[in-house]
Structures are given as structure tokens and as C-alpha cells.
Swiss-Prot record:
GO process annotations (BP): cellular response to osmotic stress; negative regulation of asexual sporulation resulting in formation of a cellular spore; positive regulation of cleistothecium development; sporocarp development involved in sexual reproduction; translation
GO molecular function: calcium ion binding
Lineage: Eukaryota, Fungi, Dikarya, Ascomycota, Pezizomycotina
Its job: Involved in protein synthesis. Involved in microtubule stabilization. Involved in osmoadaptation.
Domain of life of the native organism: Eukaryota
Protein name from the UniProt record: Translationally-controlled tumor protein homolog
KW Protein biosynthesis (keyword) present: yes
Gene3D superfamilies tied to this protein: Metal Binding Protein, Guanine Nucleotide Exchange Factor, Chain A
Length: 179
């Protein structure tokens, strides 16, 4: 299995269990799923006496449910929700992308990436940035578990069918780790 880590923060953000497609040479896209996840669950050890553990005989309190993306849940990504005021405004996100592009380029150079890889990133990134900014209002924005503001922001939108969510990540902003 291959885990993809953000080269800036080191956060795990993707794995090869997703069907990953390269877009425009610089972006990865992968289809996701949305599902209801139970919240506030009380976990008990199998065979434990619930009353001795401070629980009740019915197996604990019932939790609520929240809709999550599988990639968000699997990699403990943090959703910057617009309704909570956490999603950055478009201008702020544009500034983040500018800084992020410089950091990715430096990281590629520091790790001795081949010239072809660096040139592919330099050539493809500006068009990808424009494409992302044009569609920014449609994206859900997520960050890695560390909440490193300089790291990659994972973008989630829906395919043309309006049902299938997909994540967009920067190909050159990831490093592979075999596990």
C-alpha cells in the first residue's frame, strides 16, 4: 500500500486505495464517498461489565450522526466549513496558493527532484491555479490533521452527476511512503 504525505506538513492525506487520476500533469483527483458517521459513541471492552465501567446496561449513550467524506474520515482531515466561517475567502486562498507553490518548488529542489519533475510543476501549476480559483466557490476545503496553514489544502467538489464527490490534491505536493 502507498500512503501519500503532504511534503510540507508530513500529514497523511491520500492512499492508493483510491482510484487516483492525474489531471493536467500537476493535480491528482480521486472519487470519494459520503456517509453518515456516528458521533459521541461510547466504546466498551468486549465482555466488560457496563455498570462497573460507568456505562449503562443498554450499551452506552446514543450518539448523533454527521455526514463525512471517506477521505476526510480515513486521514483525519479537518473540514474548513464555510457556514462556520472557517473556509478562507477566495483572495486569502489565492495568497495561500502563491505561498504554497513556492514552498512546493523549494521542497522539490531540496529533495533533488529531477529537472523534468520541477519543470512539469512550473509549467502546469499556473493553469491549475486558475482552474481552481475559477471553481473555488464550489469547493469544500479541508486541511491535514496538523492544521499547518502552509501545507496543502485538499479540495472536494462533485462530479457532473451532482452525486459523486471527488478530491483534488497537488501531485507534486505529495511524497509516497510504502507501508
Amino acid at each position: 500500500m502507498i500512503i501519500y504525505k503532504d511534503i510540507i506538513s508530513g500529514d497523511e492525506v491520500l492512499s492508493d486505495t483510491y482510484n487516483i487520476k492525474t489531471v493536467d500533469g500537476v493535480l491528482y483527483e480521486c472519487d470519494c464517498r459520503k456517509y453518515l458517521k456516528k458521533t459521541n459513541e461510547d466504546f466498551e471492552l468486549e465482555g466488560a461489565n457496563p455498570s462497573a465501567e460507568g456505562g449503562d446496561d443498554e450499551g452506552g449513550a446514543e450518539g448523533g450522526e454527521v455526514m463525512v467524506h471517506d477521505i476526510e474520515d480515513q486521514f483525519r482531515l479537518v473540514w474548513l466549513k464555510a457556514e462556520d466561517g472557517a473556509k478562507p475567502p477566495k483572495d486569502a486562498f489565492k495568497g495561500h496558493l502563491k505561498t504554497y507553490m513556492k514552498k512546493v518548488l523549494k521542497a522539490l529542489q531540496d529533495k533533488g527532484a529531477p529537472d523534468e519533475t520541477i519543470n512539469e510543476f512550473k509549467k502546469g501549476a499556473p493553469a491549475a491555479v486558475n482552474k481552481i480559483l475559477k471553481n473555488y466557490d464550489n469547493y469544500d476545503v479541508l486541511m491535514g490533521e496538523s492544521m499547518d496553514g502552509d501545507a496543502m489544502h485538499i479540495l472536494i467538489d462533485f462530479r457532473e452527476d451532482g452525486v459523486t464527490p471527488y478530491a483534488t490534491l497537488w501531485k507534486h505536493g505529495l511524497e509516497e511512503m510504502k507501508v
